[in-house]
UniProtKB/Swiss-Prot annotation:
Part of the tripartite ATP-independent periplasmic (TRAP) transport system YiaMNO involved in the uptake of 2,3-diketo-L-gulonate. This protein specifically binds 2,3-diketo-L-gulonate. Is not able to bind either L-ascorbate or dehydroascorbate. Its main location: periplasm. Residues 1-24 form the signal peptide. GO terms for biological process: carbohydrate transmembrane transport; carbohydrate transport; cellular response to salt; DNA damage response; regulation of single-species biofilm formation. It comes from the Bacteria. This is 2,3-diketo-L-gulonate-binding periplasmic protein YiaO. It comes from Escherichia coli (strain K12). InterPro entries: DctP_fam (IPR018389), TRAP_DctP (IPR004682), TRAP_DctP_sf (IPR038404). Belongs to the bacterial solute-binding protein 7 family.
Length: 328
């Protein structure tokens, strides 16, 4: 009888040990391209804190900044294949999987930041998220890259004509590449991790990232001029492997989504708060900041050429553009 009791006690203890180990914290590998000084990394740490708080430490993130897990395309492939759990990158990187994502690279699409946020946080944003689910990706939230501006080492850019012949690094979006070709520039897509060296060696003259990225990546060290063109608003997508997400409990799923969204709102605020400090810092570093430019002249130079291209390439393109324009 004693032996049976001891055996039973050991069995129960073993079950408890197994249960405890099975509930040990799950770690999700989360990669992105920007540095540890960028708002993206700062907000990613908050995301992790919120997630652990809401899951009592049972679900957490392991952060991989600085392109540690590869460039955006490599990380997206990794997430789809299940070798990486999560990644964060610009919307342009998903257009090859879902052409509707090209909507977000149509220049001068949004009137202002509030219009961009309301669009992304509403039905249009939900429809774009849904377009990736069949590709093995679940979009948890939209974070902020920001308004794209032009820096270069050649001369001040004040008008569209000033872009003529400029070798400018662009992202891989067909919309963005087409826009700079219309301006007369020579757009050169290039992985983010190669941009600093490209600017330093004059392989390229210019680039067009939001200024918070220009600052954290130190592009200003190898550029002379910053023109606040605000030619496009660039969101970030925080994505997770769809099968991984579906395998989590409903409680963990909710914690993941709510934490990503709250951290995203925090990151948007960080970007807004940093703008003037970054501009001042660039001026102190010797960069000439051009604010007296006519953004309407840039928009007028494009006309509807890029919008028409989007409508031609995407069956529901006209409806999507109309939906964005109608957001108040």
């Amino acid at each position: 009888m004693k032996l049976r009791s001891v055996t039973y006690a050991l069995f129960i203890a073993g079950l408890a040990a197994f249960s405890t180990s099975s509930l040990a914290a799950q770690s999700l590998r989360f990669g992105y391209e920007t540095s540890q000084t960028d708002s993206q990394h700062i907000a990613a740490k908050k995301f992790n804190d919120l997630l652990q708080e809401r899951t009592k430490g049972e679900l957490k993130l392991k952060l991989f900044p600085d392109s540690t897990l590869g460039n955006a395309q490599a990380m997206i492939s990794g997430v789809r294949g299940g070798t990486i759990d999560m990644e964060m990158s610009g919307s342009n990187n998903f257009a090859g999987l879902s052409p509707v994502m090209n909507l977000l690279d149509v220049p001068f699409l949004f009137r202002d930041t509030a219009h961009a946020h309301k669009t992304l946080d509403g039905k249009v944003g939900d429809d774009l998220k849904a377009s990736l689910e069949g590709k093995g990706l679940k979009v948890l939230a939209y974070w902020e890259n920001g308004w794209r501006d032009v820096t270069n080492s050649r001369a001040p850019v004040k008008t569209p004509a000033d872009l003529k012949g400029l070798k400018i690094r662009t992202n891989n979006s067909p919309m963005n590449i087409a826009a700079f070709k219309v301006f007369g520039a020579n757009p050169i897509p290039m992985p983010f991790a190669e941009v600093y060296t490209g600017l330093e060696t004059r392989t390229i003259d210019a680039q067009e990232h939001p200024i918070n990225v220009v600052w954290s990546a130190k592009f200003f060290e190898v550029q002379k001029f910053l023109s606040l063109t605000h030619h496009a608003y660039s969101p970030l997508l925080v994505v997770i492997n769809k099968a991984k997400f579906d395998g989590l409990s409903p409680e963990f799923q909710q914690a993941l989504v709510s934490s990503a969204q709250e951290a995203g709102n925090y990151q948007r605020k960080l970007v807004a708060e940093d703008q003037q400090k970054i501009i001042d810092g660039m001026k102190e570093a010797g960069v000439e900041v051009i604010t007296d430019l006519d953004r309407k002249a840039f928009s007028d130079a494009l006309g509807n050429q890029v919008r028409d291209m989007f409508v031609k390439d995407v069956p529901q393109g006209a409806d999507l553009l109309k939906a964005v324009d109608e957001v108040q």
